Amino acid sequence: MAPKVFYISDGTAITAEVFGHAVLSQFPLEFESLTIPFVETLAKAENVKRQINDCFITTGERPLVFHSIVKPEIRDIIYSSEGLDYDFLNTFVAPLEQHLGVSASPVLHRTHGKANQGYEARIDAINFAMDNDDGQTMKHMDQADLILLGVSRCGKTPSSLYLSMQFGIKAANYPFTEDDMDNLKLPEALKRNKKKLFGLTIDPVRLHEIRQSRMENSRYSSLKQCRLEVKEVEMMFKRERIPYIDTTNHSVEEIATKILDVTGLERHMF
């Protein structure tokens, strides 16, 4: 039976999930998880406590409980359950209070809510990424923080959206298609913003597999075409001295982190 895991918060539960997933990924096990956000009242906390206790009674095993709860009275109710508690906020807050000589002043939703100064930057960046996805328009390239280039299905769109959502970076992306291969060159709008360009490439066999799932047995998905496009685009990256990375078998989180590392782009918000 898969171990049971609860992610609980009086906010979005994003922090609890991120930390919990990071810890549990170290173990070669499958976990059955339940995320419960916005536990903001004593009544909700008591209900969550009952769920945790019911899980313990049913399985005979104490469920893992990862939580990031600001309100002490809510936190105490969760502490009193039969779960095995991992409290991320208090684990770090108490030692920091001692080191800094300042008492924490917890504010609910400060990390992810509108009170966060980066909220507007995040929304603007997300809108920018969607409006400038896949070369839909070249009008706003001057406003971009970053312009991702590459063949179709190499990871440009998810990387652009992730960078905008997580870091408030205005990321546009532009695809090179099979029609470009005979005379592959940078459009003028990209030449004007050459310092913002960053390339993504991918193993042709992996690209073939991805395209096959979308357009099976087409020229677009053929291994020959995939090899041609990857080769031509990589040659152009080298010719134009555009930095690039290989996205093969990397998660969007890893791709985004590598892009930030290579470019030195400042994260606009955390």
UniProtKB/Swiss-Prot annotation:
Catalytic activity: [pyruvate, water dikinase] + ADP = [pyruvate, water dikinase]-phosphate + AMP + H(+); [pyruvate, water dikinase]-phosphate + phosphate + H(+) = [pyruvate, water dikinase] + diphosphate
Pfam family, one: Kinase-PPPase
Keyword Acyltransferase: no
UniProt-listed Enzyme Commission number(s): 2.7.11.33, 2.7.4.28
Keyword terms of this UniProt record: Kinase, Nucleotide-binding, Serine/threonine-protein kinase, Transferase
InterPro entries reported in the protein's UniProt record: Kinase-pyrophosphorylase, PSRP
Binding sites annotated in the UniProt record for ADP: G150, V151, S152, R153, C154, G155, K156, T157
Keyword field contains Transmembrane: no
Family: Belongs to the pyruvate, phosphate/water dikinase regulatory protein family. PSRP subfamily.
Protein name per Swiss-Prot or TrEMBL: Putative phosphoenolpyruvate synthase regulatory protein
Source organism: Shewanella oneidensis (strain ATCC 700550 / JCM 31522 / CIP 106686 / LMG 19005 / NCIMB 14063 / MR-1)
